[in-house]
């Protein structure tokens, strides 16, 4: 694999290969490769806890040496372009770049680089490693995707997770539905929009999305009061109680407790939210291994 930029660039067989390797790392069936003497730099131009720390843990476990990069103290503050920043890191011997950026498809500016790039999120575009860890979590639960009914709820328009998961899960055979305020509908995605209360007792997976307040300021979109949103579109106790016995709840996090999901349900028996985070490290080890081998 040359780069990991978008879920649309991955075939179903490549997806299965990556989640299989990640599952084998997790179970201990597959020994961890060691990339001693190779260097990685994580360039995060947007805030992150899970993705950044998960990549760092994966890199450390694989023996990579981390070249620290902080946007606040870099020449980006002097106006240096993303390409020149990345070309500099390539020139001094960095072997892999992990990049999160607010610009959709930022990687199109970097096609002259000769080192692999792992996209850790581009604006409201794609978040391939999040999608892959979600797929891994679903696979652990069900062993297949064919015919699963998946409801993705929330800020569809501004969510790179919704976009990545829609394409990949549909390709794998799942039935994806959206539930969203009309202000946050994305008409470029062809999944049907439904009322959450009409389907909550029929779905296999409820995938909640964070309300992207930071992107609403840019687009001038309407905001909701927390309780208003929670009652109309969130996972309340009443909705949780209607879920099928074997249904699971997912969220890419960070979670706005009491908004997308009732706080007490974050670690409820059907929740796989922290399992997703655990799987993220193993999945990112699989991605790094595929990019460097």
Curated annotation (Swiss-Prot):
GO terms for MF: amino acid binding; aspartate carbamoyltransferase activity
EC number: 2.1.3.2
GO biological process, one term: amino acid metabolic process
GO cellular component: cytosol
Pathway note: Pyrimidine metabolism; UMP biosynthesis via de novo pathway; (S)-dihydroorotate from bicarbonate: step 2/3
Enzyme category, top tier: transferase
Catalytic activity: carbamoyl phosphate + L-aspartate = N-carbamoyl-L-aspartate + phosphate + H(+)
InterPro entries cross-referenced by the UniProt entry: Asp/Orn_carbamoyltranf_P-bd (IPR006132), Asp/Orn_carbamoylTrfase (IPR006130), Asp/Orn_carbamoylTrfase_sf (IPR036901), Asp_carbamoyltransf (IPR002082), Asp_carbamoyltransf_Asp/Orn-bd (IPR006131)
Binding residues for carbamoyl phosphate: 50-51, 100, 127, 130, 253-254
Residues involved in L-aspartate binding: 78, 160, 210
Keywords: Pyrimidine biosynthesis, Transferase
Subunit structure: Heterododecamer (2C3:3R2) of six catalytic PyrB chains organized as two trimers (C3), and six regulatory PyrI chains organized as three dimers (R2).
Family: Belongs to the aspartate/ornithine carbamoyltransferase superfamily. ATCase family.
Function: Catalyzes the condensation of carbamoyl phosphate and aspartate to form carbamoyl aspartate and inorganic phosphate, the committed step in the de novo pyrimidine nucleotide biosynthesis pathway.
Protein name: Aspartate carbamoyltransferase catalytic subunit
Taxon lineage: Bacteria, Bacillati, Bacillota, Bacilli, Bacillales
Gene name for this UniProt entry: pyrB
């Amino acid at each position: 694999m040359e780069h990991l930029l978008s879920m649309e660039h991955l075939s179903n067989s490549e997806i299965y290969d990556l989640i299989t390797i990640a599952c084998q790392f997790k179970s201990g069936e597959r020994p961890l490769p060691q990339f001693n003497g190779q260097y990685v730099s994580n360039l995060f131009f947007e805030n992150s806890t899970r993705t950044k720390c998960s990549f760092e843990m994966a890199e450390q476990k694989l023996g990579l040496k981390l070249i620290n990069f902080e946007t606040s103290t870099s020449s980006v503050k002097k106006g240096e372009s993303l390409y020149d920043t990345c070309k500099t890191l390539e020139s001094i011997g960095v072997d892999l770049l992990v990049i999160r950026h607010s610009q959709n498809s930022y990687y199109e500016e970097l096609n002259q680089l000769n080192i692999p790039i792992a996209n850790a999120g581009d604006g409201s575009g794609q978040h391939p490693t999040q999608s892959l860890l979600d797929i891994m979590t679903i696979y652990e639960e069900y062993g297949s995707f064919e015919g699963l009914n998946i409801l993705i709820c929330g800020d569809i328009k501004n969510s790179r997770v919704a976009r990545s998961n829609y394409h990949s899960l549909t390709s794998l055979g799942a039935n994806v539905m959206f539930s969203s305020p009309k202000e946050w509908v994305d008409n470029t995605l062809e999944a049907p929009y439904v009322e959450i209360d009409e389907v909550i007792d029929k779905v296999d997976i409820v995938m909640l999305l964070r309300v992207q307040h930071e992107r609403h300021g840019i687009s001038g979109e309407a905001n909701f009061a927390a309780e208003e949103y929670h009652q109309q579109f969130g996972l309340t106790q009443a909705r949780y109680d209607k879920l099928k016995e074997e249904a699971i709840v997912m969220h890419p996090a960070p979670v706005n407790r009491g908004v997308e999901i009732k706080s007490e349900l974050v670690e409820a028996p059907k929740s796989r939210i922290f399992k997703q985070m655990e799987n993220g490290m193993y999945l990112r080890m699989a991605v790094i291994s595929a990019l460097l081998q």
